[in-house]
Amino acid sequence: MDHFVDERDLQLLQNDRYTFYVLSRVLGGPCAVIRTDHESLILCHTEHPYPVWLWTPDGLTEAEKERAWQLAQETCPMARGYRYNLKYELAEHFIARAQESGVPARIATNMFAYDCPAPIAPETAAEGSLHLCTEADIDEAAQMIYEFHEAVAADQQDIDRCRIHARRHIEHQGFFFWKNADGETVACCSWHPNAGMGSVGSVYTRPQHRRRHYAQHMVYQVTQMIADKGLTPMLYTDADYAASNACYEKIGYVLQGKLCTISAK
C-alpha cells in the first residue's frame, strides 16, 4: 500500500464524486495517514476529531471487505476511538468484525449527499439578510462553528480550534451569517470549492431562532452564488433530520448518494 495519492486515486473518486467529495478535497491537504492501492481501496485520516475516510468501489467481495477492515485496524484502530466514513456494504462488515473483536460498533450517523442542478427560490419569506463574514467577524464565526459542532454532537473541538477554522473560511470568502431584522446573527453556513463543485456546510440556526426559514433562505442564496460561479452546488446532511432534508429539497437539492459514519458503541 502506498502512502501517497495521485491522479489514479482522484479518478477513482470521480465515480463517487458526491458521497466522497470531502475525501477528494482533504487529500489535497495535510493528512496524518494515507494508504492506497490506487485501484480499490483508499484510506485517509486528516486529524482528530475527524473520522477516517475509507473509499471502496461497489460490489466488494468478502475478501476485499476483510482487507479494508485489517488495514483500518492496523492504521487507525476502532479500539483507539477512531470513527469511519464509508459505504453501507462495508459498514456492515466492519460492525460484524468489531463485534467479534470485542469492540461493539454502531452506525453513528446516516448521511445523504445532495446536489442542486437548479436552485429554486423559497416560497416563504424570511426577515433579514445574508452577511459575508470578514476578519471582524472571526470571533463570532468561531462561536457559531463551536455551537454547530455541539449541536450535531460530532467533531467537537475547543473554541481556539474553531477560531482557526473560522479564519480559514473567512480568508477565502467562505463563511456567512444570516442576520435578522434586528441585526442579530441567527444562522450560519460555509462553502468550499473543489473539482467543479461547491460544497455547503456548517449549516446551523441558533435554537431560539428556528422555524423562521432563515436557514432555507441562507442556503438558497449561497447555493445560487455557487451556481453563478459555474460550479455544481452540493451538501451533506444527516439522513435522520427529515425536516432539514425537506427544506433542502424544496430549494432544488436532489439526493445523489448515501454513506454512514460508524464508531464504537
State the predicted function of each range:
Residues C188, Q256-K258:
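Residue-level detector of high-confidence beta-strand sites
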Residues H48-Y50, W55-E127, I262:
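Acyl-donor-binding surface of acyltransferase catalytic domains
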